[in-house]
Regions:
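Conserved glycine(s) of the Walker
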Residues: 27
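Conserved Walker
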Residues: 30
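Conserved substrate/cofactor phosphate-moiety recognition/catalytic segment
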Residues: 10-12, 23, 33-63
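Conserved phosphate-donor/acceptor-positioning beta-strand/loop module used by diverse small-molecule
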Residues: 61-78, 106
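Pre-Walker A adenine-sensing motif
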Residues: 2-10
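Short gly/ser/thr-rich secondary-structure transition/capping motifs
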Residues: 3, 45-52, 86-89
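Hydrophobic anchor at the beta1->P-loop junction of P-loop NTPases
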Residues: 20
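Small-molecule kinase domains that catalyze NTP-dependent phosphoryl transfer to phosphate-bearing small molecules
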Residues: 81-119, 130
């Protein structure tokens, strides 16, 4: 099986740090795994669990902030979450500062894993001139 050499590159400290935020089951962990395979430095920022609105800035200080979003029904179907619409809305409220300051916002409801990764990589490359 042929592999894309780019996917196997180790993450370089010369590449920007990409912060990824969003509600539970929006695709953050999957995106981070894909970015890592392609040689990018990325980190999940658990802003959805914090009442400190700018925690994403204080702890991580990402060069690029990606906000992945998903609707309440989608999050429930992806992870079989047993949470209510108000629970989901509370996460949205906790994420409002990060969403307002995100460099890229993606609604992942209708996107495949590959589409999310491709859109983010295209965006990051346009920002860093890669």
């Amino acid at each position: 099986m042929a592999t894309n050499a780019q996917e196997d590159e180790p993450a370089s400290t010369t590449k920007p740090l990409i912060g990824v935020v969003g509600p539970c089951a929006a695709g953050k962990s999957t995106l981070i795994a894909g970015l890592t395979r392609r040689g990018y430095r990325s980190r999940h920022i658990a802003q959805e669990h914090s009442y400190v609105k700018d925690m994403w800035q204080r702890l991580t200080r990402p060069d690029i902030l990606i906000f992945l979003d998903a609707s309440h029904p989608t999050t429930c179907s992806r992870r079989k979450l047993d949470w209510t619409e108000p629970d989901w809305q509370e996460q949205q409220n906790r994420l409002s500062h990060a969403r307002a300051n995100a460099d890229l916002y993606l609604d992942t409801d209708k996107l495949s894993i590959e589409e999310v990764l491709d859109e983010v990589v295209t965006f990051v490359r346009s920002r860093i001139g890669d």
